[in-house]
């Protein structure tokens, strides 16, 4: 697995010195992600170099840099760890508590009046607490990023990252919750026991197939939004990218043939949303026959990688297998989304060189574009659940903000505002609120 490695190199400030370092990096077969000048002093420049490096990569790189007459390997940067030190989130008061009167109002004895008001009318919890701005981010650590089953504690930095993004992008409070259980019954029971503290539930990094059962059961018993982000957040951004790509090519997404390679949580969520969107022919490939049965129940067709590459206009891959798609199987005009992180099934540049009309990987097609606005909009509408209409509205909003790219900048707060507004509008429609029929569960 390739994980960004950050090294510090001191280079003489003269022509060609840095180029020699970069040549060594290229000869080692490493990809340069980022290059930053840290400081210059006494004729030397200190450079921070971010590389894509395998965990078992040849560490001769450092010795080769040291061997250059104009450069010196200083060490590795702790930038990533420094940004995590002490955690990435905290709870703060919305207003100063700096007088005894304020203290008595927000805590004892004044808070008792608010407690009694909520006891008399439970709906007032929405007026006098932060519940409508609070999301539980829950994991059991069985499918953390591309790292797999590493345990809930090791996944806490991911959950904190989600919470930080909620706060930064849509001003929601995300609360990471780690569950030390793999059993679906225990997961559901625990979440049901604590759900009153939260306006919505985000399920994160639960392994398939248990993730499907857990989400379905929670949706059946909780009258609040529940979303497994690995399924539906990824599906929303994928749909947005496909809307953008097909519009630019003058094609209809709904009459295109789509192949989904890999039918875990993300792949299954993508198939389900594409079918809900109205895509007529969706093929799916996976080694697990139960996964094939699951998508066939949605109206998709079981298939193989070879058939998908040969017949489909659009190919999506979420297998976690590096270089799974042979470049020679790419057909001119195909749209290729190889979404596995940190390493894709095929490099987008390679796919484009083989004739793909559009190609992207998981670095750009990222669910951070979807989940903040999805939850902000659902909470603002007091929606009892997420519906297909809400997910599709989010995808359309993302596509509308794409500009010259397949998807917009995930740090553009206007994107998240647009997504939230679209989701809230969709949630308020009668069918979404359960007033005119029951929408297909997500």
Task: Annotate each PLM feature.
Residues 1-85:
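A conserved regulatory-domain signal marking ACT and ACT-like small-molecule sensing domains
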Residues 225, 229, 338-340, 345-437:
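Adenosine-phosphate binding glycine-rich loop
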Residues 138-139, 146-147, 153-160, 184-233:
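Phosphate/diphosphate ligand-binding glycine-rich loop within oxidoreductases
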Residues 1, 40-41, 83, 125-131, ...:
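Solvent-exposed alpha-helices and their adjacent loops that cap or buttress functional pockets
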Residues 145, 152-170, 222, 228, ...:
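Glycine-rich phosphate/diphosphate-binding loop of Rossmann-like nucleotide-binding domains
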Residues 298-359, 364:
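Rossmann-like adenosine-cofactor binding region
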Residues 93-126:
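An N-cap/entry alpha-helix motif that binds or orients negatively charged groups
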């Amino acid at each position: 697995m390739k994980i960004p490695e950050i090294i510090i190199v001191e280079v003489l400030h003269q022509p060609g010195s840095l180029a020699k370092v970069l040549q060594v990096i290229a000869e080692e077969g490493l990809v340069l992600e980022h290059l930053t000048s840290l400081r210059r002093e006494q004729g030397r420049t200190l450079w921070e170099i971010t590389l894509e490096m395998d965990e078992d990569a040849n560490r001769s790189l450092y010795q080769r840099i040291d061997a250059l007459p104009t450069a010196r390997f200083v060490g590795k940067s702790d930038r990533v760890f420094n940004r995590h030190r002490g955690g990435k989130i905290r709870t703060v008061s919305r207003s100063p508590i700096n007088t005894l009167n304020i203290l008595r109002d927000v805590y004892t004895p004044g808070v008792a009046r608010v407690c009694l008001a909520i006891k008399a009318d439970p709906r007032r919890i929405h007026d006098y607490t932060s519940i409508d701005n609070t999301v539980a981010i829950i994991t059991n650590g069985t499918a953390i990023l591309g790292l797999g089953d590493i345990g809930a504690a090791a996944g806490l930095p991911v959950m904190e990252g989600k919470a930080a993004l909620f706060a930064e992008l849509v001003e929601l409070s995300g609360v990471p919750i780690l569950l030390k259980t793999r059993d679906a019954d225990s997961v559901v029971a625990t979440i049901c026991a604590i759900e009153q503290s939260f306006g919505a539930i985000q399920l994160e990094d639960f392994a398939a197939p248990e993730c499907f059962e857990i989400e379905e059961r929670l949706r059946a018993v909780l009258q609040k939004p529940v979303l497994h982000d690995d399924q539906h957040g990824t599906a929303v951004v994928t749909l947005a990218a496909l809307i953008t790509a097909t519009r630019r090519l003058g094609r209809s997404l709904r009459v295109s043939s789509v192949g989904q390679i890999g039918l875990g949580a993300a792949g299954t969520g993508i198939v389900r949303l594409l079918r809900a969107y109205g895509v007529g022919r969706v093929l799916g490939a996976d080694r697990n026959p139960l996964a094939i049965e699951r998508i066939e129940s949605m109206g998709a067709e079981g298939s193989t990688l070879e058939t998908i590459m040969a017949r489909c206009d659009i190919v999506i891959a979420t297998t976690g297998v590096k270089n799974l798609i042979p470049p020679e199987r790419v057909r001119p005009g195909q749209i290729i989304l190889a979404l596995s992180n940190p390493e894709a099934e095929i490099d987008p540049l390679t796919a484009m060189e083989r004739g793909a009309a559009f190609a992207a990987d998981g670095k750009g097609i990222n669910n951070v574009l979807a989940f903040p606005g999805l939850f902000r909009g659902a909470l603002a509408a007091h929606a009892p659940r997420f519906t297909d209409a809400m997910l599709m509205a989010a995808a359309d909003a993302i596509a509308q903000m794409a500009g010259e790219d397949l998807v917009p900048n995930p740090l553009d707060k206007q994107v998240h505002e647009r997504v939230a507004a679209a989701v809230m509008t969709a949630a308020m429609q009668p069918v979404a609120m359960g007033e005119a029929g029951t929408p297909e569960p997500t």
